[in-house]
Amino acid sequence: MEASDSMKEDLAKAILAQIREEEIVAMSCDVVNIPSPTGEELEMGRYMRRTFEEAGLSVSWQEIEDGRANVVGLWEGTGNGKSLMFNGHMDTSNTGRETFLTGLGYKPKAVIRNGMIYGLGIYNMKGALVCYTQAVKALMRAGVKLEGDVTIAAVAGEIEKTQWSDEFIGKEFRGYGVGTHHLVNHGVLPDMCILGEPTDMQLVLGHYGTVWVRISTHGHYVHTAFTRGKQDHSSIFRMKEILAPIYEWIAAWEKKATYDGQPGVVNVGCIRGGHPWRVSRTPDRTDVFLDVRVPPTMPLKEVRISVKQLVLDLRKKHSDYGIEYETFVSVPGAEISKDHQLVKTIESCHQRVLGTAATHATVLWDSDASVMTRFGIETLNYGPSSGPRDAEGEKVAIETLVNTTKVYALAAAEICGAH
């Protein structure tokens, strides 16, 4: 039976009254103070397991590999209503050990200053894990019963990293959705999902995917003394010769990859060649690595087809350069209809909490929505942040965390049939 509008208003007020800022702040500091770079999520997982158990959730521990696990907290509904998952990654964008990142927000040590919480992971995306947990606790304290299930999944290995060759191997390189892949491959299949990536409380209805590409030139391994007049035999020289055509390809691709009025983007993320410990030798191979962003409406294979044609054209012009390529990451984009129930619900709850209409966005970054969408789990990115990261590093306003928690709590109540 549908509740009356007055009952809904009373229920909303009861739920919001149970959201406690001091608990949000305390948990935020706790999670920031636990270092959890990719591959080192174990202690963070143990913390989330204890927190879920103390909240009264049914907890599953999904071991991915030695020292890494997903933690899944389930609040089972009283019926068979719509089920909702809150999903967030525990690994952080950086390790906290980088010497060139000196801002306090790049360190796994929480600092509260001027209404902001600073610290590694608070922005991406431990703050969202806090909001999920505190939203569910508020619903429970309010005495709410739900028809559908609510799940909180704290996952490992989302950050954009991958193993490559025999040089970069190990769990610290196994990211790009490894945790959420394991999650959905092992039975966690809700009707829909809220993903609290740092969107600054905008509704991200679409985001790009990516393909990572390596293009290489080969040359001759020669002592410096014998290189006079033979500089064009160096793989670095040969890479220089093909960089201009590569950048021309990039410009064309970015135009082709336009989505929702926004052009695509390609990052030249790395160039490497030679031997820094032995520069008395010419390099036999030089590599350039590209991060090619792909709209969710375009098949990923379009990158391979286009890059292959580029390489074929380069080989015709430079037949002795030994040009080769590979694609070694492929992650699709994701989108959700503006008319989906989840989108409409978040819009309504955002309006109720903030008093202003929510805005929509299309972004060039990728998220685990790529994984869940392919498993039939409609996913919306909507989460806390307080502007882009800068020299100070990661930070989120306490007010933003509180407001996001309120929106999550009301959305779960609406979607899962609170009574």
Language model region names:
Residues 2-122, 140-146:
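Acidic/His- and Gly-rich active-site-bordering loop/insert found
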Residues 2-12, 214-419:
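Metal-dependent amide/peptide-bond hydrolase catalytic core
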Residues 31, 35, 197, 239, ...:
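Residue-level signal for inorganic ion chemistry
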Residues 95-113, 206-217, 345-349, 380:
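Acidic-glycine-rich active-site phosphate/pyrophosphate-binding loop
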Residues 101, 144, 204-210, 279-283, ...:
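Short glycine/proline-enriched loop/turn "hinge" motifs that connect secondary-structure elements
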Residues 125-208, 416:
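Acidic/histidine-rich catalytic neighborhood of metal-dependent amide-processing enzymes
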Residues 86, 111-164, 215-219, 229-250, ...:
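Alpha-helical metal-binding/catalytic segments enriched in His/Glu/Asp
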